[in-house]
Amino acid sequence: MKKNETKLLASRAVNKIGNVMYDYGNSTWIAGLGSIGQKYMGYYQLAENGISLFLNPIGGAVADRFKRRQILLVTDFIGGLMCAVLAFIGNDNIMLYGLIAVNAALAIMSAFSGTSFRSYVVTVVAEDRLVAFNSRLEVISQIVSISSPLFAFLFVDRFGLKPTLILDSVTFFLSFLLLFSIREEEKHITTEKRNTSIKSILRDIKEGMIFIVKEKEIFFLLVIASMVNFFIAAFNYLAPFSNQLFVHPSSYATLLTMGAAG
């Protein structure tokens, strides 16, 4: 396996571990606030899901017209910086609002970085190695999804929220360094795409929407996925309170692991 492919896989694995740690630590902390936590958990998740709903369609259009590596580097650096700042907040009230604000900001960046990563893979990985790379990426993602909640439980239970935020910051910066060390020219930036404007991005989004509507099978799958996500949203809201519901500190981590395992 080429070095750049290894760096790309390592970057994705580290980033995913950080995301699980961040969400687990924040959710358990907010859920532990009692009745106040029930209300603010809704705000916390609404900020993420609402932003994702509106910005995900834009992410692909932006990734097509800008350098994907730069998007990934900027989002990782800002994510690491914000988590580091959060870790030094001493007031619980400020921390609560800070977690919601940073989660919203990370949702904005995720809308662009997720699409950019998938598109950047084509730049780094040769065409004849894409299938093998994607299979390795999927295996690593599944392993991380299953193991990270248990690791997050052990770490958060032992050290608390602030050290978890510091660890999240480290994962973002480590992902940044791995991506920064990759040197591959991005050839998708044509002369036309250099002259990017809001109008051109909106035109790309419109063309994508028309394509989805015309392709009935894709449209049907998206409708089904939306319906499934509606029920998953209810589960995601209740899951962080499972530690209190089942009176066991590892209940939430167990649910996340079982969900990842399918």
Model segments located where?
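Substrate-agnostic recognition of the 12-TM MFS/MFS-like secondary transporter fold
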Residues: K7-Y24, Y44-A61, K67-M82, G98-D157, ...
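Loop-to-transmembrane helix entry
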Residues: I36-A47, F246-A261
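Helix-loop junctions on the cytosolic side of multi-pass membrane transporters
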Residues: S119, T123, L161, L165-T196
